[in-house]
Amino acid sequence: MDKLELIKYDLYAQDLRRIKHIEGVAESAIEIKNRHFPFITDETALCAAYMHDFTKEYSREQHFAIFERYGIELDDCEARTEKLWHAKSAYALAKYVYGLDDGICTAVLYHTTGRAGMQPLEKVIYLADYIEKTRTFVDCVDVRDTYAMLCEKRDKNALDSAILYSLDLTITDLLESRRMIHKNTFEARNYLLKEGIE
């Protein structure tokens, strides 16, 4: 059994409620990487896609057991924001249990917050997670439609522009709901603006 098959076997064994979303991310990841980064292999994109929410439904105890076992530290925002835990615990499993390469692991790690200077696979998983077809939130649909329109126009910055738009919407939502915003998200947005992305 290769690594991708093992990840899928272990994932489906969890009886996840989110499996449709994860499958949607896998499908979108293939589409996005084929359009922008065809050098990324299908297996690489799929490993990252299937790992990204691998621990999403874990309990607090399960997350923190992983953090302790693998020496994963949380900053103040992460410690106070439960929705960020799964990215770090899934990263730990990707790296230490499944032995996936660093590119896949960082794509899993930053799929929720983004970061400045995201690498190709990180961009693929970040956007795939936001726009996959089962997402029905207004913001997700808006970014999905915007990305499709930019691609149709053959905009060379379609991917980065869609990511920037999603970051704007995420920050706005977090501000309006008075929740903490991770510094990586601000830095990801500012980096794209400095690169001239609109």
Predicted regions and their residues:
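A generic structural signal for short
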Residues: 17, 78-79
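Alpha-helical segment that forms one wall of the substrate-binding/catalytic cleft
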Residues: 86-95
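Divalent metal-dependent phosphate-bond-processing catalytic cores, especially two-metal-ion Mg2+/Mn2+ enzymes
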Residues: 13-23, 27-38, 51-55, 62, ...
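An amphipathic alpha-helix signature
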Residues: 4-8, 26, 30, 91
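His-Asp-centered metal-binding catalytic motifs of divalent-metal-dependent phosphohydrolases/nucleases
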Residues: 6, 42-77, 90, 108-114
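Catalytic, metal-anchored helix/loop core of enzyme active sites in primary metabolism
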Residues: 82
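Generic N-terminal amphipathic, Lys/Arg-enriched alpha-helix
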Residues: 1-15
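N-terminal alpha-helical segment
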Residues: 3-5, 87, 104
